[in-house]
Amino acid sequence: MMQRRYCHIYLLRVVFILFTLHYSLFTRSQDSFSQIDESGNVTQRNSNQNFNKHNNDTTKNKEVPKGMKTWTVDRKFGNVIPTEPDTLHHLFPQSLFNWGRYGEYNTVGSNYTARENRIFIDRKESSPFIFTDPYSFFMVEPDEFLFTNTLSPLTYLTYDNCGDKQNGEDRLDAKFAVNVNKRLGFGFQLTYDYARGYYSSQSISHFNGSIFGTYLGDRYNAHFLFSTNHQKATENGGITNDEYIMHPESFNDDFAENEIPTTLTQNWNKNDNLHVFLSHRYNIGFYRQVPMTEEEIKAREFAKASKEEKEEKAQKKEGKDAPKGRPTDAPKGRPEGAAIAGMEPPKDKTDAAVDSTRIQVDSQEKLDSLNRLQAIQDSIDATMKREYVPVTSIIHTLELHNYKRDYLAYQVPTGYYLDRYYTTLGGDSIDDQYKHFQVKNTFGLALLEGFNKYMKAGLKGFVTHEYRRYDMPDTLGTTVFQQRWTENNVSVGGQINKTQGETLHFNLTGEFWLAGEDASQLKLDFDTELKFALFKDTVRVAAKAFFHRLNPSFFYRRYHSQHLWWDLQDELKQEMRTRVEGNLSYSLTNTRLRLAVEEIQNYTYFGMSYDHFDDGTINSPGPANLTVGVLQESKNINLLTAQLFQNFRLGPLNWENIITYQNSSDENVLPVPTLNIFTNLYLKFKIARVLDVELGGNMTYFTRYEAADFCPALNQFAIQKNTDSKVELGEFPFVDVYANMKLKGVRFFVMMSNMLDSSGNRRYFTTPHYPMNGRVMHMGVSWPFFN
């Protein structure tokens, strides 16, 4: 009955959204109608919904330009990388969930929680402050942020909702961007994620506030990003017995999701962090004429029309303000019969000589020909602009990061942790605090490609200094205090790349650490792309390769807490990773093939071990004697990955597939599912030629494997190490059905997730003992506002 009542509520919400959209479209068509002014002239009501005769809105009855460009920047050099705006209609619902657009992430159940990619080659390297890495859905790195240049002020509002006040999830995202002129732009973004949780002690909230600015002048370019984040996650340690989900009939009572017992209560992970990113450069070069884009031409015409209308209104106002019966004074030229006073100067004999530098117009035909040539030149000038071509750039990039983490617990089950190293709050309470401060400066000099026909590639050289500071608990006898560690690193490197042209692109970057904690580290990265025509279509061949020799990050080497402790700075070796990857895509058949081979030496990871007691009752104690440590595998690990992206289309029917095969040489150290499948079947059509509709369903499926467990005290995923308590996950189809629509730029959807929660083996876990949400209806909308 409860589920039926919620379904009725959701249906009412859907009807309300559709009615609102219909009403807004209907009223928009009624925005203007006739009115008669004091002079008897018939006009239309102003677009701002009033009859004010002094309204000076210069955008009335003219199309507001909606051109928008978005890009990301290279984190080291600040290079502009054009990208698509985040306004895509396709897979819009899936983009709002932290299990990924293609369902490729393992999570700890609720939306916005910690996650880890099942596709190993798509995982990112660990950051200096590892505790925020699992929140990659929420955290936006500087090289992932979308900078914006818009022809008119732009506001985007996105809202997603499911559930009710006890268990629901809400996401609200607002982004504003405006350009002062074609060079200077700024904006801000606010994001609030809140999931109350369908299971006990599972609420999570994130808040982000970001301010960004760009200046893209001829000689000076700058990108600035300031962001602050607050994250608070309630940790429940998973449910005490998986049978509550997989075999609920084995219990005498029926348990709602929020009644299933969990391991932990009153345990929290709190993170606060602040980030500043500034990349700027000074360019030395020259000017040349280039054609304008259609959007730039429209913007110029819009500005010209606005200026003319403003001048016309000013002239009309000038005439209306004159006294009645008295015409306004206007110059009418020289009066008839007027003579010039004084004597006419004598003519110089040299005036009779012909000026050979001037064009002689001696006939009407020649005058018409010159006028036509001038008209053609004026037409060309109207669509041309002057572009600055940089030759050399002086580059500086600054990154500043400030982190604080607090793991707080008021209750811990007896025997849950194996070890205890100190006590701060007394009893079983925990208050472990960690801080990290980082400043990185990169100075570079670049010789840019394309400033002449012989410069086919760009060259860059750079030097980087990085300062890192860490604070965490330490002990001296029985005294607990905050100890501080500092690190300084200096590295140098270079880059050669080719990004212009349509056929061949490549990029080779190398960096070597000269001094500091990370001395002797090495990073070599190479990628290339080749395009060529085949059967009247385009084949794209891309390849990537890298060799990284890096130290494990600070908290792998050293970590102190009340129940977990290690100092391995003298024991861990540098981790070496080598990967070669190829991509082949052919747009005619909608096919893309990705193949990667990777070898890892000294693979460093977290291992987690505990005893799992299960007596089959509601009072089952769950995990006990938990311990987590850092492990390093001495032998080489090899990983093979093959991905097939294949799309089919037959009329309105579309079928998209991503099939991933992975093979690890050591599943005990690096477990991955052998197969991971995402499939999306939907109908794509229009209603009344204005409403775009995608109606269908998608499924995510992966084969059984020993997925990484999750440790709340560390906020990290860790490999299962106790043979007696290991569990396998997988072989459950996660099916979602949806109606995804777009109307005049407004995107909205209705989705029912995990449709098969009561079918099959009911093994809807992606992390051991953390079930995913059951069947839930989601609704969301994204609305753009221009001007």
Q: Each predicted region: which residue ranges?
A:
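Intrinsically disordered, low-complexity segments
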Residues: 22, 27-30, 354, 361, ...
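Exposed, low-structure sequence patches enriched in small/polar residues
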Residues: 16, 150-152, 226, 260-334, ...
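Bacterial Sec-dependent N-terminal signal peptides
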Residues: 1-38, 739, 751, 774-787
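Generic low-polarity alpha-helical segments
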Residues: 1-4, 11-15, 24, 28-30, ...
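Membrane-proximal, glycine/serine-rich, low-complexity loop/turn segments characteristic
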Residues: 30-277, 281-352, 356, 533-538, ...
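A generic structural signal for short coil/turn motifs at secondary-structure boundaries
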Residues: 7, 164, 196-200, 515-517, ...
